[in-house]
Amino acid sequence: AWVACETDFVSSNDIFQKFAESVVNHVAHAAPADVDELMGQTFHDGDKTLEVMLKETIAEIGEKSEVAGFARFEAPEGGSVEIYQHFNKQIAAMVAISDAGKADTGYDVAMHVSNLKPEYLTRDEVPADVVDHEKQVQLNRAIEEGKPEHIAEKVVEGRMGKFYEEIVLMEQKFLKDDSKSIKQLLEENGIGVSQMARFAVGENNEDDGEGEDE
C-alpha cells in the first residue's frame, strides 16, 4: 500500500508507520476493489473505518496524509509474492512468481521493476491503440529521414522492438545482467511472473510528497 504524507519527518513517525501497517494488513484481509472502497470499510481488527482512522492519524501527526493507492496479489499455488523496497521507502515494487523456492530471483525481478519502470508485463498487454500510434510515429520519422516506404516499414519493425524493450517487462534487459532479458532470466530459473506493481512517491498521483510504501 502507498500511504503518502508531506515530509520525511512524518514518514518516519511511529504513529504514521503504524497506520500504514494497518492499511497493509487490512488490504490483505479484506481485499477492497479500490481506495474508495478501502476507506469506507471497517478495519478488520476493530470498529472504525479506515477513513476515521486516517483522520485520527492526521490529527495526531498534524500533517496532511492520504492512502494514495495499493496493490493486492494472491500468490499462485506453490508460488509467492516478492517485494522490493528502496531504502528511503519512496519506491517499491512487487511481483507474483510461480515458484516460492525461487524467491531470490523474484526479489531481483521486483528490484528491476522498481528501477526500469515497465508499464506492461508482456507484449500482448500493450493496447492496440498504443502500438498503432507508436508505429505511425516511427513510420513518419523514417520517411522524414528520407527512407523509401518499403525500407521505412522494415526500420519501423526494428524500432518497435526498442519500444517494447522500454515498456514491457519480459522484453527488458535484466538490470543485474544486461546480456539477458527478463524473459530469459525467468526461463533459466523455470518460473513465471503473473503480476507486477510499482509505487513511487510523486509519480502515482498528482500530489508530490513523502510517503511510506509498505
Model regions and ranges:
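N-terminal assembly/interaction segments in proteins that build large macromolecular machines
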Residues: 1-214
